[in-house]
Amino acid sequence: MPKLIIVTGGVMSGVGKGVVVASIGRILRARGLSVNAVKIDPYINVDAGTMNPYAHGEVFVTYDGGETDLDLGHYERFLDVELSKRNNITSGQIYLTVIEKERRGEYLGQTVQLIPHVTDEIKRRIVEASGGYDVTLVEIGGTVGDYEQLPFLEAARQLGLELGEDVVFIHVAWVPLLKITGEFKTKPLQHSVAELRRYGIQPDAVVVRSEKPIDANSIKKIALFAHVPQWAIFNSYDVDTIYRVPLILEQQGLGDFLTRRLRLPSRSPEYRDWEEFLSKLSAPKYRISVGMCGKYVELPDAYLSIVEALKHAGAALDARPELVWINSVEVEKNPDILRKLDLDAIVVLPGFGKRGTEGMIECIRHARMEKIPFLGICFGMQLAVVEFARNVLGLKGANSTELDPETPHPVVHLAPEQREVDVLGGSMILGNREVEIVPGTLAASLYGVSVITERHRHRYEVNLSYLPKFTEAGLVVSGWRRDIKRVEIIELPGHPYFIATQFHPEFKSRPAKPRPVFLGLLKAALFAKR
């Protein structure tokens, strides 16, 4: 039988429930258990692929091409696993599947209803995802009381009834600190637990999210009104880095509680590598100023995995990347702002659409001309090709056909397999692809192997008809798609560090396993500083 830890949220969203879930996973992994994690998003979208990054943040791409919630990135980084697209369940997926089954006659003439048909489909997916694992974490997105959560809470209630002692319910809720009196206000949490109990779910444990460590009297009050023992109330307060949360919850006894409650093997947790990473992350010797140029920089969560990948690489080098967010629209208005920033490295970020792209191209030109270590990712690589075509080859008006369909020099164009696609969602080049590294290149020295596997999310590619001109002018293609001829990595010899990738290296970065292109960027920046 599967063992499930079902996590709900109360009071308000966006308080770090996903980090708490990932931390629980890390705690169990430290005991040698195999752990899976599922994120439920109650929105009607089938997946996150078409959602506005300002509203939703980053779209995290799984190895099998799922466009998922950014919490799956937290899960992968904390658990050091690769998750599937089946690990992100949405209302859209559930309703679509139920309707398709009804159209095929699979319900044999029944009146299809929320209960049992929708809830059965939810349960089926959760149980299916839990197969082969010691424990599966299930995070129900949103806040208890949201209308769209109801079928998922009902499915969770039914699973608790059907699986009994093999299900643990944990409720995560924010407790605000009233600064005028210095008092924690537990009433909103009490109400959220009361609301959860209305749906037939009594939490076995509560994780209190708070700005500062919560006091003993507040814990007593929560225990009384939430009907949870004091020893099953834990506190995830604000800390300098999210990677410290597993150790805080471990010290409070959450690991031992879950081991007892789910009758799991009792083993001493092993955190040696995690603690070593934390010590380097928290007290670095060096600082590196990294310019992050993109069009969604007002919401850094739109680039969350890149931010984390830079942290991982920095910790490996005993350095802290200090991120300078550069709005490419502002660069278009005033390119001179780049000179005033005194950057040690520049990353040009992924994106879509025309807005702000000339500012991104200017950032690339600045990095190339001023010999500043540079990394371009996905759209950033395509724009690096455009910049080189315009300013080195002298191809006036060179562009991507995504940005200018009438460009006289389409150095980046729609990939052949995308030209007949007329559906927006789930139709890009997605997921893992193998990339062959060209020997004797910067990419070869970074990766140290001839073939790598990286995750993708794009529609456009470098136009190979311009390749002879690029090669003659000194641009090197150092990585190719293995199954078809497609440019995956470009670089500029003679520059301290200038490399760009069509793939997204950030999605496979882990705290103890930073990705080579991020390591190389920060190494080059450190070398230049010295």
Curated annotation (Swiss-Prot):
Keywords: ATP-binding, Glutamine amidotransferase, Ligase, Magnesium, Metal-binding, Nucleotide-binding, Pyrimidine biosynthesis
Domain Glutamine amidotransferase type-1: 289-530
EC annotation from Swiss-Prot or TrEMBL: 6.3.4.2
One GO MF term attached to the UniProt entry: metal ion binding
Catalyzed chemical reaction(s): UTP + L-glutamine + ATP + H2O = CTP + L-glutamate + ADP + phosphate + 2 H(+); L-glutamine + H2O = L-glutamate + NH4(+); UTP + NH4(+) + ATP = CTP + ADP + phosphate + 2 H(+)
Binding site for UTP: 13, 185-190, 221
Annotated region described as Amidoligase domain, given as residue ranges: 1-264
TM regions (residue ranges): none
Residues involved in ATP binding: 14-19, 71
Record-linked Gene3D superfamilies: 3.40.50.880, P-loop containing nucleotide triphosphate hydrolases (3.40.50.300)
Swiss-Prot/TrEMBL GO biological process terms: 'de novo' CTP biosynthetic process; CTP biosynthetic process; pyrimidine nucleobase biosynthetic process
Cysteines paired by S-S bonds: none
Active site as annotated: 378 (nucleophile), 504, 506
Binding site for CTP: 13, 146-148, 185-190, 221
Reported regulation of activity: Allosterically activated by GTP, when glutamine is the substrate; GTP has no effect on the reaction when ammonia is the substrate. The allosteric effector GTP functions by stabilizing the protein conformation that binds the tetrahedral intermediate(s) formed during glutamine hydrolysis. Inhibited by the product CTP, via allosteric rather than competitive inhibition.
Keyword hit for DNA-binding: no
Primary enzyme class: ligase
Keyword match S-adenosyl-L-methionine: no
Pathway note: Pyrimidine metabolism; CTP biosynthesis via de novo pathway; CTP from UDP: step 2/2
Ligand binding (Mg(2+)): 71, 139
Pfam families listed in its UniProt record: CTP_synth_N, GATase
Purpose of the protein: Catalyzes the ATP-dependent amination of UTP to CTP with either L-glutamine or ammonia as the source of nitrogen. Regulates intracellular CTP levels through interactions with the four ribonucleotide triphosphates.
PANTHER family for the chain: CTP SYNTHASE, CTP SYNTHASE-RELATED
Note: CTPSs have evolved a hybrid strategy for distinguishing between UTP and CTP. The overlapping regions of the product feedback inhibitory and substrate sites recognize a common feature in both compounds, the triphosphate moiety. To differentiate isosteric substrate and product pyrimidine rings, an additional pocket far from the expected kinase/ligase catalytic site, specifically recognizes the cytosine and ribose portions of the product inhibitor.
Family indicated by similarity: Belongs to the CTP synthase family.
Listed name of the protein: CTP synthase
